[in-house]
């Protein structure tokens, strides 16, 4: 009987490597993965005119003419940074992306605090 110390020296790797071999020296047959023809069939259908036009809009042009994609890119861009609306930063402080009106200059923001308080 082989001791565990011998198997730990590298014999274990040899046993694990030879494990899939059958007694006659041929590799054990591997199980085949089941095919799912229902998922493959829709992709084999011919492309119609409407779907071909949709695919043409999604695929970038090969000749370098990107004017067709400019309209789609502008539509996808939202009111905030990277298409996401930013309420606190963009609206309140004016520090967000895609601002429509520039932020007021610093002196205009400070003036209301510099006015003397009237006591009546």
From Swiss-Prot:
GO terms for biological process: regulation of blood pressure; vasodilation. InterPro entries: C_natriurtcpep, Natr_peptide, Natr_peptide_CS. It is found in: Secreted. Coiled coil: none annotated. Keywords: Disulfide bond, Hypotensive agent, Secreted, Signal, Toxin, Vasoactive, Vasodilator. Its main location: secreted. Belongs to the natriuretic peptide family. Natriuretic peptide that dose-dependently induces the rapid relaxation of rat aortic strips phenylephrine-precontracted. Acts by stimulating cGMP production in a dose-dependent manner (by probably activating NPR1 and/or NPR2). May also show potent hypotensive effects. GO terms for cellular component: extracellular region. Expressed by the venom gland. Residues 1-25 form the signal peptide. Disulfide bonds join 81-97. Residues 26-70, 110-120 form a propeptide. Transmembrane segments: none annotated. It comes from Micrurus altirostris. The keyword Glycoprotein does not apply. This is Natriuretic peptide. It comes from the Eukaryota.
């Amino acid at each position: 009987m082989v001791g565990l110390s011998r198997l730990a020296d590298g014999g274990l790797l040899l046993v694990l490597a030879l494990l899939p071999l059958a007694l006659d020296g041929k590799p054990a047959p591997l199980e085949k993965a089941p095919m799912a023809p229902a998922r493959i069939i829709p992709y084999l259908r011919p492309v119609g005119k409407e779907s071909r036009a949709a695919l043409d809009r999604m695929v970038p042009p090969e000749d370098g003419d990107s004017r067709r994609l400019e309209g789609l890119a502008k539509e996808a861009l939202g009111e905030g940074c990277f298409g996401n609306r930013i309420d606190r930063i963009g609206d309140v402080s004016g520090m967000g992306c895609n601002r429509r009106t520039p932020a007021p200059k610093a002196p205009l923001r400070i003036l209301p605090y510099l006015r003397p308080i009237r006591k009546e």
